[in-house]
Swiss-Prot record:
Superkingdom per UniProt: Eukaryota
Gene Ontology terms, MF aspect: cytokine activity; growth factor activity; transforming growth factor beta receptor binding
Alphabetical GO biological process terms: cellular response to cGMP; cellular response to pheromone; dauer entry; dauer larval development; defense response to Gram-negative bacterium; detection of bacterium; detection of molecule of bacterial origin; determination of adult lifespan
The protein, known as: Dauer larva development regulatory growth factor daf-7
Keywords: Cleavage on pair of basic residues, Developmental protein, Disulfide bond, Glycoprotein, Growth factor, Secreted, Signal
Glycosylation sites: N23
Family assignment from sequence similarity: Belongs to the TGF-beta family.
Locations listed in the record: Secreted
Annotated S-S bridges: C241-C251, C250-C315, C278-C347, C282-C349
Protein's organism: Caenorhabditis elegans
Tissue: Expressed in the chemosensory neurons, including in the ASJ neurons in males. Expressed in the ASI neurons.
Any one of the GO CC terms: extracellular space
Amino acid sequence: MFMASSLPVFIFLLSLPHGLTFNCTNSGVCIEKMKQHRTEYLKNEILDQLNMKEAPKGLKPMDPEMKSVYLEMYRDLLEKDEQDMGVEMSFYTAKDPSYGENPSQLVAKFDVTNDLERSDILQATLTVSIEIPAKDSGMLQDVQVQVYEKNEDGSMGEMVTSGIFATKGSERISIQLPIDTVKSWFTISPIQGIFVKAMLDGRNVALHPQQTTADVDNMRLQLSTRPKGSRKRRSHAKPVCNAEAQSKGCCLYDLEIEFEKIGWDWIVAPPRYNAYMCRGDCHYNAHHFNLAETGHSKIMRAAHKVSNPEIGYCCHPTEYDYIKLIYVNRDGRVSIANVNGMIAKKCGCS
């Protein structure tokens, strides 16, 4: 048990976890400092959750056309978001297992680094570029696509899947792969890679890594995975106040984060997002605010009973949402992950 005289120190220590926000007036300088403080906090959280000690450096600039592909993909992902926390999407660009020594052997290898023994694969998608001669472009044609395993000795293995696609020219097509088969490739039954057969007029029009040096034309494997046992629904932030109509009380305000402006061009999408921030004065029994029922709040009530003028409440987020990021990791691989705690949804005083 502690004496009443030690109460202010104890309360100060309890306030430290809420150091993301601090009481300040509507001073522009103070508000800018708060924005910088929260931005730095969010940057550190992103790095921590992506298992990075620092932002990747020395990465090759992404081809603008390839970046457009990922941005379009990001928009599609948001539209059909399953509202699952813990889901990670990873993209693997095909490699030549012979490293150019045997260009006549068409095979695509994918270096999957995910621990698939401890994860469930939700979806496996192979994206392939098909190259149609200019003379045949503009005319709708059916192309039958077949995906085969290539055994470790280089021999042709089993057919994995097939499909028929209507095309008017060169384009990228996506075909779903059997989840159990894909998981076995990277766990119990390793293969050399895959071979794609897309026949048109007696010619295979599917591009393999031996036939192109452009990332945008190369094959890509997209895996959606979730650690076993994790599932959680998301919700959305609702701003309460704005800069033009500021509240004197604790309130939620916009905070736009632009990744290129903070020097983080390794974040591919979104280019910017609203993280929101909590700020404003907290007064006990203020007419515009209900204090959070926490142990901290009870101690603060005790502080008010001893009428200590130096003790105040801290305005801080009480609910958060995640953000989906497409980013380039240290190895130069493009991945997608949901990063928790990136959007403040609701404010409280304690």
